[in-house]
């Protein structure tokens, strides 16, 4: 019974982590294209490296939280960083939680308009209502959503990738360091990790961290590889589109495009609820308001910022928060290694 409980808790934690990372930027194929495919033949090595980094970070974060009994993001930063660096990172990351939620809101609006042919604001309203319901029911609801949707995400991406075949185009290397690109990609995608995992059930088993890490690293590298290969199999025209994975899926037939739509919507929802939870906890801690008031504030701000297009969030806003992600990632790994 104890073993079964440990496995379930670890699996839930891994699903929450994966659901948090696999947002609209990942599911659209835009992140995979910009951070990996544009490096030509080196993209596979970069994808493997990113998987290893996800493994290390998720293992370290989980282990640090378990060993120190950490319950909040602020406590986590005090442990791994401390001082002014922790304060700076916490405030920048707190803003990032809000921005990520706004980006997922914009992505839902874009999906409503581009995929379903309905009003942009209908999509925005729908995602806000669903997120509000889940967030009000706490971390348990987020875990349930993640453990249902993440396996479906992986299956959907796999099904599309299998149909795509093995023939791919060659991309001219744009130059630069694929290792640095992978590092930046992982750093900003894991900013929310500590805030969300700190709210999950702690597990005393010493293998919790490494199993969580293996599941997260393997899933992210596998899905990234499948998305990248699918895009390359569809030709150079698809590579240059705003949502390359959607364009590649559409070329495979209506059934596979519908599978992509399901993948995209699931990725938007899982990331939105994780970042929404983190944003609300940050607001409660800093301005001392109730969860309900913090949720209302989040929804109002999301409506105000929804006029920014999703593509602008990914290309112009995300990179601004990279420094907080890099600081957190480096200090997390440094602390983890030092304590071992």
In which residue ranges do the predicted regions lie?
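Transmembrane-helix boundary/entry motifs in multi-pass membrane transporters
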Residues: 38-44, 67-97, 114-120, 245-261, ...
């Amino acid at each position: 019974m104890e073993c079964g409980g440990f496995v379930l808790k670890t699996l839930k934690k891994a699903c929450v982590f994966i659901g948090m990372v696999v947002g609209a930027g990942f599911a659209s194929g835009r992140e995979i294209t910009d951070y990996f495919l544009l490096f030509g033949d080196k993209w596979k090595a970069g994808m493997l490296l990113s998987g290893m980094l996800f493994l290390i970070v998720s293992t370290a974060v989980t282990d640090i939280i378990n060993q120190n009994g950490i319950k909040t993001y602020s406590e986590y930063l005090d442990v791994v960083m401390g001082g002014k660096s922790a304060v700076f990172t916490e405030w920048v990351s707190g803003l990032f939680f809000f921005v990520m939620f706004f980006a997922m809101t914009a992505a839902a609006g874009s999906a409503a308009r581009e995929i379903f042919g309905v009003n942009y604001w209908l999509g925005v309203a729908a995602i806000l209502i669903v997120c509000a319901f889940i967030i009000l029911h706490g971390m348990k609801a987020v875990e349930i959503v993640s453990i249902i949707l993440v396996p479906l995400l992986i299956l959907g991406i796999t099904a599309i990738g299998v149909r795509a075949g093995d023939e791919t185009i060659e991309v001219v290397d744009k130059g630069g360091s694929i290792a640095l690109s992978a590092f930046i990609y992982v750093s900003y995608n894991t900013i929310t990790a500590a805030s969300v995992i700190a709210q999950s059930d702690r597990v005393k088993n010493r293998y919790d961290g490494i199993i969580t890490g293996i599941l997260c690293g393997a899933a992210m590298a596998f899905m990234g590889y499948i998305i990248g290969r699918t895009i390359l199999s569809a030709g150079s025209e698809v590579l240059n589109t705003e949502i390359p994975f959607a364009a590649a899926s559409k070329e495979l037939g209506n059934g596979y495009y519908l599978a992509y739509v399901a993948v995209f919507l699931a990725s938007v929802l899982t990331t939105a609820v994780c970042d929404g939870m983190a944003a609300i906890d940050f607001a409660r801690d800093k301005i001392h308001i109730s969860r309900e008031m913090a949720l209302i504030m989040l929804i109002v701000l999301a409506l105000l910022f929804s006029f920014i297009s999703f593509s602008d969030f990914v290309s112009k806003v995300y990179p601004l928060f990279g420094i907080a992600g890099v600081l957190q990632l480096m200090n997390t790994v440094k602390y983890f290694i030092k304590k071992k």
